[in-house]
């Protein structure tokens, strides 16, 4: 297994080396208008260091916090389906494949939708609302499991996982746009730092919470964390 993972990582590194290149230099004969646009100095807001920018930090914290419910699903959905749902390998695999495929499709659709309508902030707030609602529904269904079919609980879990995974590209694009081209790398690095802090903390927080309560409380906590990000994606 670990050998296969090593080969996949090596393949990714090889493709990255092969496909990622610096963009070609601007041709000398480029239109004057294009050169003027390229040479136009950034606005005062975009020239500000992202580390000192409140709006940038709000988006960064929103991204980091909203990743926590996603990590909860990615790291503990299989445990939940096995321990709570008593599903076997085939059922768990089918649920996770459906979740990941749905998330992939929704990420692409979300990016195209917001590119066409220019509504990234509104879309992010809507994503927070839907994600928080879906995890609340999952918590309620889990708490009422004696009266809720297992298939419905699995479907809600898959739906919640898709909803909390669909916003990534939109949020990162909004962050890079807010920071400006000259500071996009810094801003994205800030976001990734917070994201990986959540990736570290979420799996550590869930086991003691689960031991002290139940799965419904775990999913409710995920809903509360998702909902807490709503004001961080407020309109400019």
Go through each PLM region and give its residues:
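Helix-to-loop junctions at the C-terminal end of transmembrane segments
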Residues: 106-119, 210
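C-terminal ends and interior cores of transmembrane alpha-helices
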Residues: 129-146
């Amino acid at each position: 297994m670990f050998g296969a993972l090593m080969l996949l990582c090596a393949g990714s590194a090889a493709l990255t080396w092969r496909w990622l290149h610096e963009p070609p230099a601007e041709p000398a004969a480029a239109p004057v208008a294009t050169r003027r646009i390229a040479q136009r100095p950034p606005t005062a807001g975009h020239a500000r260091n992202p580390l000192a920018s409140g709006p940038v930090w709000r988006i960064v914290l929103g991204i980091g916090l909203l990743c926590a419910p996603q990590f909860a699903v990615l790291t503990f959905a299989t445990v939940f389906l096995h321990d709570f749902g008593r599903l076997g390998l085939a059922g768990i695999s089918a649920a996770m494949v459906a979740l990941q495929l749905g998330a992939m499709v929704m990420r692409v659709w979300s990016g195209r939708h917001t590119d066409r309508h220019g509504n990234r902030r509104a879309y992010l707030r809507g994503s927070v609302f839907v994600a928080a609602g879906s995890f609340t529904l999952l918590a309620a269904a889990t708490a009422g499991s004696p009266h809720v079919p297992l298939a419905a609980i699995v479907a809600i879990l898959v739906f919640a996982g898709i909803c909390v995974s669909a916003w990534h590209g939109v949020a990162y694009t909004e962050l890079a746009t807010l920071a400006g081209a000259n500071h996009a790398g810094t801003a994205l690095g800030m976001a990734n730092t917070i994201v990986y802090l959540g990736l570290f903390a979420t799996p550590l927080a869930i086991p003691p919470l689960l031991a002290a309560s139940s799965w419904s409380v775990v999913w409710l906590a995920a809903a509360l964390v998702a909902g807490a990000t709503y004001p961080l994606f407020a309109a400019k």
